[in-house]
Amino acid sequence: NGKTWSKTQPLNDGKEFGAIQPVVLNYGNGKLQLLSRTENELVTQNWSSDYGITWSKMTATSLPNPNSGIDGVSLKDGRQLLVYNPTGKNWGDRVPLSLALSNDGTNWKRVLDLEPLRENTDKEGEEYSYPTMIQAPDGKVHIVYTWNRKTVKYIVLDPQKLN
């Protein structure tokens, strides 16, 4: 009805970046970061400093992405956690499935492979995709994702143990 929400202009033109399925990270005091998967072999970002009323131009991050789903959460300790496939070929491998941490949304460090690339295996059909995650009131992070397009996997971890 527009009484409790408003719509902004498109955040990209679809030409420079083919971006879809965004994730919003909250840094507090109105500062938001939008991360998107793309067909451009990387994750893109937009920033807002006014609670999402206006947004910066979409730009590339240093995070590789094979046009696969990502998810992120703003942790209670102020860090940002991202789950993603860190490969860069468009429609490329969706393995490994990894976690990256950032203090500022600009500098990301890959800290854990939830599903690593295994030695001596045929990668055909090996896929870990469409992740989603939350941080529960107890501080633990709960992650679910599609496993080999056959089932769903679930992981719980303590983000304080991630460096």
Predicted feature descriptions by range:
Residues 1-163:
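Asp-box/BNR beta-propeller blade signature and adjacent active/binding-site loops
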